């Protein structure tokens, strides 16, 4: 059977199916489609037919194949990522997932994680991501593990939403009994300091009675990347404010009452 006939039967529909049909696999490490082992064909058929995010990492190098639902997980690395070794696709998290891949291939035991944090670089910047995922062995005709089936659900938005909701509750609980402005500010900073992942820096400024300047009252411990926190910020219009205040749009916030 010719390669295009095998590909038509194997890859089915969908965006990824069309992309795989258009690929000349004979020029890749996977080789011509008609030479693929039945175990890979069967696993890929299940993967491409599923509406749940699934990917296959095949062979010792973990050559990556995936379905339409999994494609957003790789972000802007698609379509370059298709057919690439796992370590090339995920260098930023390989220290975390590489040993797990090796474990599955060596032992035939699956791996499961819930709300696992992985700091991924998939849209041009590093982002904090969370996933429920499994790594499941795919056994070949010889009985050994020849590949890994990755079933995954991204939970980033839920995890971040839950974490930020907890912070708001903590903020409300800590400040509810405060009796002075100074006490309120101190308790606010205490609450904000509990979540450095979402609030790496918080500075609380108090506006003077004449509304001419905002003075630093308190704040969280600044990270190394933020060496400068002005003690006082002029609330004059930008064109008349001192140079040191022009990078801090506090005046606009005070004047418009908008964030």
Where are these regions (language model features)?
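PAS-associated C-terminal cap
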Residues: 1-3, 153-163
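GAF sensory/regulatory domain recognition
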Residues: 21, 61-85, 190-193, 197, ...
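PAS-family sensory domains
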Residues: 133-134, 144-154
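Output-coupling edge of small sensory domains
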Residues: 116-118, 136-141
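Soluble sensory domains of the PAS superfamily and closely related sensory modules
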Residues: 21-27, 38, 45-49, 92-121, ...
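Amphipathic alpha-helical coiled-coil segments that mediate homodimerization
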Residues: 39-43, 59, 167-175, 180-196, ...
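Sensory modules in modular signal-transduction proteins
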Residues: 33-66, 197
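Flexible loop/coil segments at beta-strand boundaries within sensory signal-transduction domains
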Residues: 123-125, 138-144, 210
